[in-house]
Every structure is written in C-alpha cells, then in structure tokens.
C-alpha cells in the first residue's frame, strides 16, 4: 500500500515555518504531521544547553519486511536571510519552475522529496528512517551526533544513508559526494613582553616569532592528493595583536589557520604538527585546535550505484562521484554505515 504526498506542498509548508539555527517547534510539527500518517514512528528530542543548545532533533522509523534499512539524514535549520530578498524569505513562492524561500535548496526541499518518495514506497518494503536535526548550520554540537546516540540506544542502525545536502554544480544530479575532506581550525598564541618601541631591549616582541612560525607552516606541503581527494591545504585566516598604538610593542600575538585535509591525515596529527613547528620557534607558544570533522570516503559500491541509477532514471545524467567542497553531517554518519 502506498500514499501520495506532493513534495512541493510539503516543501512550501516547511519553508513557511521559520527555523533559523537552532530550529525547534513548528517546523518539526509540520514534518511529524507528514510522517505519522505514513506509518512512521516519530520521536522528537531536545538536546543540549546554552550556548550551543537547546536543539530539537527528530528520528522517524518505518519498519518493513525487506532486509535492507535505508536512512535519510537532513536538517530543518536554516541560516538567517541575508540582504537582497525581494520578499519575505519565509513566504514560499513559485516563479516559473523554481521554488523560492529560505531552505528551498538547503534543505527543506530535499526532506520533502524524500518524504514523498517514502509515501510512494510500499510499506512492506525495507525499513526507512529519517534522521533530522535542528542544528547543522550552527555549532552542530547537539545535532546529528546526539541523534546518533539516540539511535545507538535504540539499536537503530541503517545499512546505508543518503544525506540530502545540495551537491549539484551545473545541472540537478550532476554530482554525488562520496566523501568529504576533514576540517580543523588552529589557534597559535605567542607570548611576549610589552614595551615602548624606543626601548626594544626592555621588551620581547612576539610578532617576529609569529611571522617565523607562520612562514615555517606555509612551507609545509601536506600531500599531493589521492585518487579521490584533492591535495590538503593550509590557509591562514586571521592575525591579531590587539594593539591600537603605533609606538607600543604588543604583549602577545595570535594567528588562526584552517586546514582542509584528505584521508591521509587525522585532525589531531595536524594540530600536533603545528604545535611542534610553533614551539621550535618559541617554546612558550600555545596551540589549540578544534576539529570539525575527519576526512572520510565511501568507496564506489552499492550505495553510490543505487543513487547514480536513480539520478540517471530521472534526469538522464551520469553523476560524477566527488569529494570536493566543504563538510556536512556525513562526517559523523559515516561511522554508522556507507553514506553519500
């Protein structure tokens, strides 16, 4: 037995429920209202405390007779509307064959499409689940990772997961992400002794030391890439000394860098490398890293072939399998099963 859900109507209803990170309440009511009549058991959780919470999360499961469990992961939160909107970003509007509204692409439209597909799937087929968070665009501390803990406590483990992030480049369906690079942000603090520029012998200027540290880091070539990943890259993103005077040697200097790395590296190893370089120049230098996610790869196989066949059937395109771009919650979910 199957049902019918119009994905456009559902997408419009989701867009019409404002859900800037962290999303809670009304937008989850809309999704739950669509899933319950389809036979899904829906659980909603409030996870976390300030400053990164509370966050609402939703886990919906419809058990089937088939042997496979197919999961869909997504997020209902959106980034705040920027300038340039010609109307209310939370009032969905169809112009021609395009749907406009905050979250239409990332990713309320994808969630609506999957719910419509689930409605059209016989209830006696394999098990379907939706893993939906209210915090993917923000800190993501109490989002998908918290949902994974709920799943583990309930013994829920999909065989494969599709993440509904937009990955197309020029045409819908032209690219599928089968992996993502890891990401780590690193802060370097170099201490010194404040003083007057006329008396440098009474001060200890941290800026030349920081410059030497950054120069040494800049000379590092992490790798030449792999079969599936582009070369890892180090980018300096900020330098600050907090010095508004022209005649004062600052007491400290700080820099921030970001590393996007492939699966030849681990985040902690890169933080340790930067720390060694910094302390070779200044033993008192402090290095702190924040790993957003490790690199992962889902080698081409059953899941990517299934997705490619579905795309080809609907669009006539053969999608490119890629690992380019930024991170997504797939960086957490790959620990459960193959994910694209």
Where are these regions (language model features)?
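Acidic/histidine-rich catalytic neighborhood of metal-dependent amide-processing enzymes
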Residues: 107-179
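Short glycine/serine- and small hydrophobic-enriched flexible loop segments
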Residues: 13, 116-122, 212-219
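Active-site metal-coordination/substrate-binding segment of hydrolases
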Residues: 69-132, 154
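A structural signal for short hydrophobic beta-strand segments in well-ordered beta-sheet cores
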Residues: 42, 60, 92-94, 236-239, ...
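N-terminal helical capping/dimerization or prosegment-like subdomains
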Residues: 1-81, 252-258, 270-276
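Metal-dependent amide/peptide-bond hydrolase catalytic core
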Residues: 1-3, 80, 167-171, 178, ...
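Short alpha-helix boundary/capping segments
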Residues: 41, 99-106, 198-206
